Amino acid sequence: MNEQDKLKKAVGEKAATMVKDGMKVGLGSGSTVYWMIRSLGERIQQDGLKIEGIPSSNQTATWAEEAGIPLTDFSNVKELDITIDGADEVDANNHLIKGGGAALFREKIIAQAAKEFVIIVDQSKVVETLGEFSLPVEVLPFSWQRTANEISKLGCVPTVRVHEEEPLVTDNGNYILDCPFKVIPHPDKLNKEIKSIVGVIETGLFIDMATTVIVGEKDNIYIK
């Protein structure tokens, strides 16, 4: 296991300790969340922890089932006690870019549904200003080229994310446009501008949503 994976494992295990008996838990996506799910599974097996989870992606659902975490959905749950997820960038104000794993729409739903939204990252994801990581935007496949052209007027050249030489299709049946803005000094303004474009489903900008950010750096875990 390399150093970055060790940090992901450490922050994932730390976040898992925040989950208490009886909680409804939003399960995010990505490699850091994998370790959190593993740790929750161990607590279920060893300590009899009783929780229910709502996954943000099909991959997360598979990991949760393998870990023995009972799953539910929003037909049975109105509110989540906690959602734990990773991020691609976290800025000085704890605004986020997410969506590198193409699950941003469902991730935002379970984040907004939770009383507490905990982000787990390694130090490499912490930045002063968002934008170095291309901003993912989920769009309808119908006329995605036109949607991309409208987004380009805001200051970037979007590209459709591909998988095996075809546009990647999200769990919701949509496409992802990766938008390299380079620097996003006013994420709230940009988020509103992009979401006003017809054809946009959701952006990977998570503004004022994270309640806690757990960061792993060499030999240390700190709360941001």
Swiss-Prot record:
Record key words, sorted: Isomerase
Keyword flag Ubl conjugation: no
Listed InterPro entries: NagB/RpiA_transferase-like (IPR037171), Ribose5P_isomerase_typA_subgr (IPR020672), Ribose5P_isomerase_type_A (IPR004788)
Residues forming the catalytic site: E107
One GO cellular component, as annotated: cytosol
GO molecular function: ribose-5-phosphate isomerase activity
Coiled coil: none
Residue positions binding substrate: S29, G30, S31, T32, D85, G86, A87, D88, K98, G99, G100, G101, K125
EC numbers: 5.3.1.6
Catalytic activity annotation: aldehydo-D-ribose 5-phosphate = D-ribulose 5-phosphate
Gene Ontology BP, a term: pentose-phosphate shunt, non-oxidative branch
Keyword Isomerase attributed: yes
Pathway: Carbohydrate degradation; pentose phosphate pathway; D-ribose 5-phosphate from D-ribulose 5-phosphate (non-oxidative stage): step 1/1
Pfam families the UniProt entry points to: Rib_5-P_isom_A
Membership in a protein family: Belongs to the ribose 5-phosphate isomerase family.
PANTHER family: RIBOSE-5-PHOSPHATE ISOMERASE
Subunit structure: Homodimer.
Function: Catalyzes the reversible conversion of ribose-5-phosphate to ribulose 5-phosphate.
Protein name according to UniProt: Ribose-5-phosphate isomerase A 1
Source organism of the structure: Oceanobacillus iheyensis (strain DSM 14371 / CIP 107618 / JCM 11309 / KCTC 3954 / HTE831)
